[in-house]
């Protein structure tokens, strides 16, 4: 495996050739500047000999059909392995769900991004590939962040693409973080990366980014980088700004960020999450409605169990509507403009 990676510099290809696990860990050096450690399939760490005090996690492929972030991360890994760029921050790349990537599907058995913060081991337990992998990914995050002294900035960008078109092509979800202000610097980093819209979540979740935020105090986000396309069919010119800012972050080049300005970004607050309680749950709007479509107060969003679910605020925007989820799961997130967010 080591020689195959040294020859090809293609970590994604190696991962997909061994989607369940690698037989053993291995490591090697790049020149005199970087120690590279491969912990498992889809798990590679770059440890600079001299680093600038940030511990960066870039994860992708938690959903196997969300290919643009996978190609973006593999491109950065390849540049690092080719020594075209040199890491100056400790960096962990995670390719989340290799089995689903090979399968060309979002999941194998279950939505992995609902299985973190220990949810993977709640009943029925570790019964499918996503649950097993989620537990391993948590362990790799823990190993990476706790291998060095506290006090360093921890960052985790969990990269996705959405199943539908969006009024705002690229957007990020800022996990619930009670007692901690939202970072204006991070929001402006996202804006410089082409991600000009941020949703502030209002409650704990079992997503990957919430896990890193809550457990390790990381500046963590779920980042949606556009729409789902098959591998190799993404227009990577749409990610030039994202690639550039991630490269600057990893190599400790000046980020040259603007000061936080709420007028330069679109900020939303999650006002509620609507879960499914009956099999007959259905939305009243078209199945292909774009993310961030806005509806007025009193509009009937959905019906289930003989009840109507209506818009409660003057206007509410919807993201991730999906009526075809199991009972108990989220069908849609409803948003209102964020006017009093604690951003510093």
UniProtKB/Swiss-Prot annotation:
GO terms of molecular function: hydrolase activity, acting on ester bonds; succinylglutamate desuccinylase activity; zinc ion binding
Cofactor: binding comment: Binds 1 zinc ion per subunit.
The protein's required cofactors: Zn(2+)
Organism domain of life: Bacteria
UniProtKB keywords: Arginine metabolism, Hydrolase, Metal-binding, Zinc
Catalytic residues identified in the record: 224
UniProt pathway: Amino-acid degradation; L-arginine degradation via AST pathway; L-glutamate and succinate from L-arginine: step 5/5
An annotated GO BP: arginine catabolic process to glutamate
SUPFAM superfamilies recorded: Zn-dependent exopeptidases
Key word Translocase present: no
Enzyme Commission numbers on file: 3.5.1.96
Catalytic activity: N-succinyl-L-glutamate + H2O = L-glutamate + succinate
The protein's enzyme class: hydrolase
The keyword Glycoprotein is annotated on this UniProt entry: no
Binding site for Zn(2+): 63, 66, 160
Protein purpose: Transforms N(2)-succinylglutamate into succinate and glutamate.
Alphabetized HAMAP family for the sequence: Arg_catab_AstE
Protein family according to the UniProt entry: Belongs to the AspA/AstE family. Succinylglutamate desuccinylase subfamily.
Name of the protein in question: Succinylglutamate desuccinylase
Species this protein is from: Shewanella baltica (strain OS195)
Gene that specifies this protein: astE
């Amino acid at each position: 495996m080591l020689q195959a990676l040294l020859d090809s510099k293609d970590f994604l290809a190696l991962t997909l050739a061994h989607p369940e696990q690698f037989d053993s860990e291995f490591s090697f050096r790049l020149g005199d500047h970087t120690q590279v450690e491969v912990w498992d399939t889809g798990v590679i760490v770059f440890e600079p000999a001299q680093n600038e005090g940030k511990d960066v996690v870039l994860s992708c492929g938690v959903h196997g059909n969300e290919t643009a972030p996978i190609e973006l991360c593999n491109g950065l890994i390849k540049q690092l392995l080719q020594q075209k760029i040199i890491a100056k921050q400790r960096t962990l790349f995670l390719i989340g769900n290799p089995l689903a990537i090979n399968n060309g599907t979002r999941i194998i058995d279950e939505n992995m991004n609902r299985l973190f913060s220990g949810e993977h081991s709640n009943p029925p337990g570790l019964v499918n590939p996503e649950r097993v992998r989620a537990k391993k990914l948590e362990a790799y995050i823990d190993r990476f962040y706790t291998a060095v002294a506290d006090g360093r900035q921890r960052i985790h960008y969990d990269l996705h693409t959405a199943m539908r078109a969006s009024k705002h092509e690229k957007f990020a979800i800022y996990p619930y973080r009670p007692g901690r202000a939202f970072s204006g610097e991070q929001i402006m980093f996202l804006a410089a990366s082409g991600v000009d819209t941020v949703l502030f979540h209002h409650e704990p979740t079992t997503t990957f980014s919430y896990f890193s935020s809550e457990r390790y105090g990381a500046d963590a986000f779920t980042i949606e980088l556009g729409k789902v396309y098959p591998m190799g069919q993404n227009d990577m010119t749409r990610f030039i700004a994202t690639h550039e800012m991630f490269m600057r972050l990893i190599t400790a080049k000046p980020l040259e960020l603007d000061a936080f300005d709420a007028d330069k970004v679109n900020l939303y607050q999650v006002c509620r999450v609507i879960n499914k309680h009956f099999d007959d749950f259905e939305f009243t709007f078209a199945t292909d409605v774009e993310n961030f479509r806005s509806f007025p107060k009193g509009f009937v969003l959905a019906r289930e169990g003989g009840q109507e679910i209506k818009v409660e605020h003057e206007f509410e925007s919807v993201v991730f509507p999906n009526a075809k989820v199991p009972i108990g799961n989220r069908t849609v997130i409803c948003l209102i403009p964020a006017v009093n967010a604690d951003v510093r």
